[in-house]
Amino acid sequence: MTSSSPILKQTPKFLSALEGQSHANPPVWFMRQAGRYLPEYRAVRATAPDFISFCFDPEKAAEVTLQPMRRFPFDASIVFADILLIPGALGQKVWFEAGEGPKLGDMPSVESMAEKAGEAGKALSLVGETLTRVRSALDPDKALIGFAGAPWTVATYMIEKGSSDRSGARTFAYQNPETLDALIQVLVDATIDYLAMQVDAGAQALKLFESWAEGLSEPLFDRLVTQPHIRIIEGLRARGVTVPIIGFPRGAGTLVEDYAARTPVQGVALDTSASAKLGQTIQKTKTIQGALDPLLLRAGGDALLKRVDEMLEQWNQGPYIFNLGHGILPDTPIAHVEAVLERVTGQKVGQ
């Protein structure tokens, strides 16, 4: 297996930040930067019959991945896909309903899913085709990020069949610990294979999205978040994958510091609640990423630019990647994105 994508003449700023370097103007990208706030995205999305088909169309997915790179001076591009592709690869039906979000069918037995976990990369090879298309079109100084939903977060959707109420999954964790641990391990194995495929296809960095880390007790957080992340990273390294990895335990609060200390990630993405001190503490050993509130980005005005300045002042003395604390909202004005990017890059952006 290829341990990393082809060597480029210039190390992208995003990757150098993950190596621990600081920059006068930090690298910047936004979660969900390819999305509905862009009219060009909406135009392409309208040509796909449904969201899953959209994710599995390499031509369309590559196009929307590249759209924000053409419009804005982002330093990294993240492949357009979804965290719920892995359940489909394991045999659970996944679909999206307009205005309601993801829906999942009955979860197959853990035993049947375990048989498919080692073939997740093959089952999701169309995402690899998207990555290859994007990498060939990206400027050499721009980095390409692959990603996956982390096991606990994916498991919550699989257990609750798409419900946004995590209480059912937490209750399942208490009542069925052995079954949940087995499911988490299946997802660890599938995620390793899926992410290794993404690196082979051109991803230069990886991100684990633990979107539902909030509300877990310290013992549950260790069992369902920290330990599975460690196993994924160790599994990738054992397969020769050397690219940097960012972990995003969203909503974990003070447990993020322990997560950063114990997991072998190179970067830790912070959510909007992260304090200046928390970020500075983690920066002593890791690169941090984040953590502008998407609601503030949408609101705009003086408060937005003031917060951008605060974040740069408190975190840009160490290795730092400017980003949001969650995905960009669909009704975010493009002018607000441009204003933030002007402030971060020090360059004129937009018209």
UniProtKB/Swiss-Prot annotation:
Keywords: Cytoplasm, Decarboxylase, Lyase, Porphyrin biosynthesis. Pfam families: URO-D. This is Uroporphyrinogen decarboxylase. GO terms for cellular component: cytosol. The keyword Cytoplasm applies. One of its GO terms (biological process) is protoporphyrinogen IX biosynthetic process from glutamate. One of its GO terms (molecular function) is uroporphyrinogen decarboxylase activity. Its EC number is 4.1.1.37. HAMAP family: URO_D. It is found in: Cytoplasm. PANTHER family: METHYLTETRAHYDROFOLATE:HOMOCYSTEINE METHYLTRANSFERASE RELATED (PTHR21091), UROPORPHYRINOGEN DECARBOXYLASE (PTHR21091:SF169). InterPro entries: UROD/MetE-like_sf, Uroporphyrinogen_deCO2ase_HemE, Uroporphyrinogen_deCOase. Homodimer. The keyword Cytoplasm applies. It comes from Caulobacter vibrioides (strain NA1000 / CB15N). NCBIfam families: hemE (TIGR01464).
